[in-house]
């Protein structure tokens, strides 16, 4: 199968892009799929530079680099949205390109045959109206985010409401939202996955001492971990407020992600927990962060799946998430994870953290159950489900 894939970037430091990298590797390797990847940036994925288009059936990933521009996200997206389609039109018109299908992880083009839905901007737009993040307190930033979410919501209306476009959701929650907003009742659930060769209790424990020493965490300190690129959406305000109720306990918080730490440091200072927080930018070696932690906590306000939660589970960490995270549908509350019904419920989060802090045996049992539960989320199974979706779409 000759497949055009459209994504602004691919790497292994962001949830959607990591999932795409794992998928493309397996479609090329396991199903001999010839993938033409139209993207502005590609990292940590083995790709070939296309010299010419041919009718051969050799599987592989061929990167067609699409230029990018600096500036606000909305302008960057508009440029990307139109240019990637122009590049594909040029390749088909003048270079002999031919694609059986066009696949997109989310809203990236108007002509995708299949869209794997990782985030819904209708829902994110609703959340942005309900609360204001400390990282976007300025009027211009709020206006820009509102305009950006509004534009993508209109594109979702146009694309996701079209029954000719095959959709897949990464969680039952996302499938329910697609039905709510677009009346789509034909959406299969294809959950994301975890690579056990990268994330496991054995690998985490082997690096624990070094990872904690690097950050000067003491042996008697319980370290909470939160990973994400939108800390407000991942529930950081709730976690910081919960820390204020654990002042009698030796608890630290490690926050990792591509967000602006300055306003969050200020919030932590106002809450009196600044000395308990460590802020880090994302890196390719994300296992190092899991190795330093004792509990993964992310009471997300909205999360289509929750890759860091799944990776934390695979590492054998007890996890706390919210019912607003897609991964919650796969958890047994109190067995292989803890689920907050309300992501803003600071009191309940503090109580659950206090319970985990005081019961190392419970942490161990829950972490072991979490690791066992994560074993069923494999990238090979994910790729097989997507391949079946591709086959159905190509035969229609």
Each PLM stretch: what is its role?
Residues 17-22, 222-245, 262:
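A conserved mid-protein helix/loop that constitutes part of the nucleotide-sugar donor-binding site
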Residues 173, 193:
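Carbohydrate-associated surface elements
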Residues 282, 301:
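Aromatic "clamp/platform" in nucleotide-sugar-dependent glycosyltransferases that forms part
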Residues 209, 230, 252-275, 362:
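Short, structured helix-loop element that forms part of the nucleotide-activated donor/catalytic region
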Residues 210-213, 362-376:
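A short, well-ordered alpha-helix in the C-terminal region of glycosyltransferases
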Residues 139, 144-168:
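Membrane-proximal helix-turn-helix segments that form the acceptor-binding/catalytic region
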Residues 318-321, 331:
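Short hydrophobic beta-strand element within catalytic cores of glycosyltransferases
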């Amino acid at each position: 199968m000759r497949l055009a894939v459209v994504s602004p970037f691919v790497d292994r430091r962001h949830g959607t892009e990591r999932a795409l990298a794992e998928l493309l590797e397996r479609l090329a390797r396991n199903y001999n799929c010839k993938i033409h990847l139209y993207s502005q940036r590609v990292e940590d994925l083995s790709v070939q530079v296309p010299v010419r288009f041919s009718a051969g059936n050799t599987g592989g990933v061929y990167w067609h680099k699409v230029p990018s521009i600096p500036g606000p996200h909305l302008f960057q997206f508009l440029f990307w949205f139109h240019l990637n389609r122009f590049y594909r039109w040029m390749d088909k018109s003048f270079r002999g390109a031919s694609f059986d299908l066009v696949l997109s992880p989310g809203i990236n083009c108007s002509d995708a045959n299949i869209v794997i839905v990782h985030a819904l901007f209708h829902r994110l737009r609703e959340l942005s109206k309900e609360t204001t993040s400390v990282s976007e307190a300025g009027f211009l930033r709020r206006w820009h985010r509102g305009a950006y979410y509004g534009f993508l919501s209109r594109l979702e209306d146009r694309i996701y409401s079209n029954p000719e476009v095959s959709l897949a959701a990464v969680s039952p929650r996302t499938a329910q939202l697609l039905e709510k907003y677009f009346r789509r009742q034909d959406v299969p659930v294809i959950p994301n996955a975890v690579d056990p060769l990268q994330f496991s209790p054995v690998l985490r424990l082997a690096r624990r001492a070094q990872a904690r020493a690097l950050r000067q965490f003491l042996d008697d300190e319980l370290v909470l971990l939160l990973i994400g690129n939108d800390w407000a959406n991942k529930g950081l305000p709730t976690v910081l407020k919960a820390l204020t109720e654990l002042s009698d306990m030796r608890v630290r918080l490690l926050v990792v992600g591509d967000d602006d730490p300055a306003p969050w440091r200020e919030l932590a200072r106002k809450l009196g927990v600044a000395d308990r927080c460590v802020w880090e930018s994302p890196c390719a070696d994300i296992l190092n962060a899991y190795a330093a932690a004792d509990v993964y906590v992310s009471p997300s306000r909205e999360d289509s799946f929750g890759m860091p939660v799944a990776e934390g589970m695979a590492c054998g960490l007890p996890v706390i998430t919210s019912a607003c995270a897609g991964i919650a549908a796969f958890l047994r509350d109190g067995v292989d994870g803890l689920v907050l019904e309300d992501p803003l419920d600071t009191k309940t989060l503090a109580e659950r953290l206090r319970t985990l802090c005081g019961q190392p045996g419970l942490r161990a049992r829950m972490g072991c159950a979490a690791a066992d539960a994560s074993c069923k989320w494999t990238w090979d199974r994910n790729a097989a489900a997507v391949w079946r979706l591709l086959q159905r779409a190509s035969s229609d």
